[in-house]
Amino acid sequence: MALIHEILGKLSLEGNQSSSRQSKLGSVKAATHFDAEKDAAAIETAIKTKGVDELTIINILTNRSNEQRQDIAFAFHRRTKKDLPSALKGALSGNLETVMLGLIKTRPQYDASELKASMKGLGTDEDTLIEIICSRTNKELLDIQNAYRELFKTELEKDIMSDTSGDFRKLMVALAKGRRQEDGNMVDYEKIDQDARELYEAGVKRKGTDVTKWITIMTERSHPHLQKVFERYKSYSPYDIEESIKKEVKGDLENAFLNLVQCIQNKPLYFADRLYESMKGKGTKDKILIRIMVSRRNLDMLKIRQEFKKKYGKSLHYFIGQDTKGDYQRALLNLCGGDD
């Protein structure tokens, strides 16, 4: 079993990090002395083993980088003439199958697939739609759009338009376009004050809410800029931005704005909160738990773990250990990367 290296480093500014580059804050590092053919052969043997050798499959796929997993899938197809996803579907089941199938997709493919599933059939899974659209960078959103087009032969924006309505639709479409300013190094205090004042005047100060103004500011300004805007906002409004959102809008739009503000202020804490919510009380919201563990493992899992421990007193590793079991638990703990 390859060792999982814990490499702490400075969090890169969003937009400057290539989607193909391993983040220093990810919990899963590329395996050294990697041999795709050897891994593919081991997975083939594990699948053919009577009862299936899940442990071997888990140990390989949770301890390789995304690029290495793509190489393994290619090598597997070359040697068996079968697609790795199809082979895993036939060999695994339940939550473990969901995790393993998620791991062998590229990040854009995974997000695109989750978004498609959230809008498939009757009704919309707004929770998934909001989480992904609110938390991804411009580059990630562009990559998701391309993957969505390639996988489903339609446009992401078109599906969002047909599956949502009203101001919630406007917010989701504006975010999905990925047009946020990401040059957060320059501080424009005049613009910060102007945006804070306009947010106040478009909401709490008036009767009714100018949602379009809120959408424009919150989907186009950089995260560092908006963090300062939200601070400045308190000098105009008797309520902070989150309290103002709760007073001004309701339903999916309220939920979306609140998720967006959390992502802007502290994205790792946002995901830590989501993970906690997925495991607190009786039962587990496996869909949320799996999606975050799979999608953040190479990006900021170490930072998420840090925020989780700081806020909830016990480690993410501990919570997963208490809330899951068996091979599914083992896979998630490997993605978590260690205890704190």
UniProtKB/Swiss-Prot annotation:
A Pfam family it matches: Annexin
Keyword line: Annexin, Basement membrane, Calcium, Calcium/phospholipid-binding, Extracellular matrix, Phosphoprotein, Repeat, Secreted
SMART domains, sorted: ANX
Compartment list: Secreted, Extracellular space, Extracellular matrix, Basement membrane
Region (P10 binding site): 2-25
Modification type Phosphoserine: residues: S27
Record's keyword annotation contains Electron transport: no
Annexin repeats: 34-105, 106-177, 190-262, 266-337
Major site of localization recorded for this protein: secreted
Biological processes, Gene Ontology terms: positive regulation of receptor-mediated endocytosis involved in cholesterol transport
Record's keyword annotation contains Transmembrane: no
Secretion signal span: none
More about this protein: It may cross-link plasma membrane phospholipids with actin and the cytoskeleton and be involved with exocytosis.
Similarity field: Belongs to the annexin family.
PANTHER family in the cross-refs: ANNEXIN, ANNEXIN A2-RELATED
Record's subunit section: Tetramer of 2 light chains (p10 proteins) and 2 heavy chains (p36 proteins).
Entry note about domains: A pair of annexin repeats may form one binding site for calcium and phospholipid.
UniProt function note: Calcium-regulated membrane-binding protein whose affinity for calcium is greatly enhanced by anionic phospholipids. It binds two calcium ions with high affinity.
Name of protein: Annexin A2-B
Encoding gene per record: anxa2-b
